């Protein structure tokens, strides 16, 4: 894994999910997570699902205590933001070393989830909800 690691101090990755966009910066450190200037667990309301989602790419490679993660994220809700951060972290780890790509890809951390809110259509109340039908 360490065969092609570059001697660069900062690794960037961008992740997206629904309407959330996250710019993730990985710096060699001891596992600190800062999201929009706040502690990661505080920003995500101490939700273990979101916290594990964010740490998943680093845990896949066994680097959870080797890099600090500084994140700038906007748009969407907490779940969308957490998944955007996960993808951004995975892309930053691919920039760190090309050997990291295969394990991250098999775990699904690099794939963009295409599901988004469906647009509302005219004649309907919501995207698919139709007004009540009356025969007479």
Swiss-Prot record:
Q: Which GO terms describe its biological process?
A: translation
Q: Which domain of life is it from?
A: Bacteria
Q: Which Pfam family is an annotated match for this chain, by its short name?
A: Ribosomal_S9
Q: Give the PROSITE patterns listed for this entry.
A: RIBOSOMAL_S9
Q: Does the keyword Ribosomal protein apply?
A: yes
Q: Where is the composition biased (Basic and acidic residues)?
A: 98-116
Record field: compositional bias (Basic residues): 117-136
The UniProt annotation puts the region (Disordered) at 97-136
- One GO molecular-function annotation for this sequence? structural constituent of ribosome
Output the Gene Ontology cellular-component terms. Answer: cytosolic small ribosomal subunit
**Which keywords has UniProt assigned to this entry?**
Ribonucleoprotein, Ribosomal protein
InterPro entries, A to Z = Ribosomal_Su5_D2-typ_SF, Ribosomal_uS9, Ribosomal_uS9_bac/plastid, Ribosomal_uS9_CS, Ribsml_uS5_D2-typ_fold_subgr
HAMAP family xref list = Ribosomal_uS9_B (MF_00532_B)
Family of the protein in this entry = Belongs to the universal ribosomal protein uS9 family.
Q: Which PANTHER family match?
A: RIBOSOMAL PROTEIN S9, SMALL RIBOSOMAL SUBUNIT PROTEIN US9M
Identify this protein by name. Answer: Small ribosomal subunit protein uS9
Q: Which organism is it from?
A: Prochlorococcus marinus (strain MIT 9301)
Q: Which gene encodes it?
A: rpsI
């Amino acid at each position: 894994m360490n065969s092609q690691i570059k001697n660069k101090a900062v690794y960037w990755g961008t992740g997206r999910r629904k309407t959330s966009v996250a710019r993730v910066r990985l710096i060699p450190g001891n596992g600190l997570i800062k999201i929009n200037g706040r502690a990661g667990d505080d920003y995500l309301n101490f939700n273990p699902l979101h916290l594990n989602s964010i740490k998943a790419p680093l845990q896949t490679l066994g680097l959870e205590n080797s890099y600090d993660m500084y994140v700038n994220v906007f748009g969407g809700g907490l779940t969308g933001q957490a998944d955007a951060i996960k993808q951004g972290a995975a892309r930053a780890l691919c920039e760190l070393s090309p050997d990291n790509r295969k394990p991250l890809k098999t775990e699904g951390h690099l794939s963009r989830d295409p599901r988004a809110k469906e647009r509302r259509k005219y004649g309907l109340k919501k995207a698919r909800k139709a007004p009540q039908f009356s025969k007479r």
